[in-house]
């Protein structure tokens, strides 16, 4: 047995170790044959011989298991070395990827409002008439409901035309106070130099109990936001109309391209339209069961902001995957 123990200690791999185990404990192994011979021995002799065999088996197993564990660890280390990444193969001159300008612009917008303790709310892309139109105070005759402008399914569901339905879902699920933005994709049947069938919006909503929220609050909040996005620009509010806000306004900033001198982008007005806003219409509160509350809402197109931030003249180029354009935003 001592000879086998010495062979075990000299083993350098698991295959050799297994060969030794078979020669001792295999079907024709030396100890196996010894146990087979016990059948023909008398009781006293059998007892004594069996004790010796069991002692030798225990010594062998102890040596075998210790060596097996050592060799298994060595084999594992070798496999880990073979599977390890060789960082010498990586070429540092290779350029890395980067966020698409639309996504980086959306991230910048979201980060701003998160810092002001706004929540991020999400909703389904496929909406129903109530959440997308009716609860937002859009009458049946409103042109946005027309098949020419909205993607409808056969079951009268539709692809949402704005992220405003998320505001309705949030108000139905929560009580004031609410400070939220709803970023996401929206869909309209439009495709030209400034419109695509799918684009991204960020809409915001602030609702407080009582009559605490005024247009002055809205104006101050949006002026700070627009200067955060575009730097030291002038901001102006123009009266407008949206079914879900009253009063409503469209917001312009001084042209970031020509600095109010007049150019093709601003149509020689010196101003660029960037978003819409207003005080939430009381009819909207009636649809969600709110009473004695006040608030404001606003909405912007992320692609529009990306175009202005990065001076991209054609909106469609953002979705064409042209590497010559996208490589500029690494």
From Swiss-Prot:
Location of this chain's protein in the cell: Cytoplasm
Cofactor dependency: Mg(2+)
Entry superkingdom: Bacteria
Gene Ontology CC terms: cytoplasm
GO biological process per UniProt: phenylalanyl-tRNA aminoacylation
SUPFAM superfamilies reported in the protein's UniProt record: Class II aaRS and biotin synthetases, tRNA-binding arm
Family, as annotated: Belongs to the class-II aminoacyl-tRNA synthetase family. Phe-tRNA synthetase alpha subunit type 1 subfamily.
Full protein name: Phenylalanine--tRNA ligase alpha subunit
